[in-house]
UniProtKB/Swiss-Prot annotation:
It comes from the Eukaryota. Keywords: Acetylcholine receptor inhibiting toxin, Disulfide bond, Ion channel impairing toxin, Neurotoxin, Postsynaptic neurotoxin, Secreted, Signal, Toxin. Its main location: secreted. This is Alpha-elapitoxin-Na1a.
Amino acid sequence: MKTLLLTLLVVTIVCLDLGYTLECHNQQSSQTPTTTGCSGGETNCYKKRWRDHRGYRTERGCGCPSVQTAIEINCCTTDRCNN
């Protein structure tokens, strides 16, 4: 009986996805909102905003890019927080 319970426990652990994947928005500027699952090590979502000859541009995705001049970057750590 103990062997059966142990076997069921092992099968359950193997079959379940115990990992957590952060989900971030990844659309650009005026595109329809979409999301993506980030790679295993990613713990941040970002929203990058800047102005060019077409007006304000927005980029979203996984990770947290380094700071750049004249570009507003917001990083966050919860699912779909970069809307």
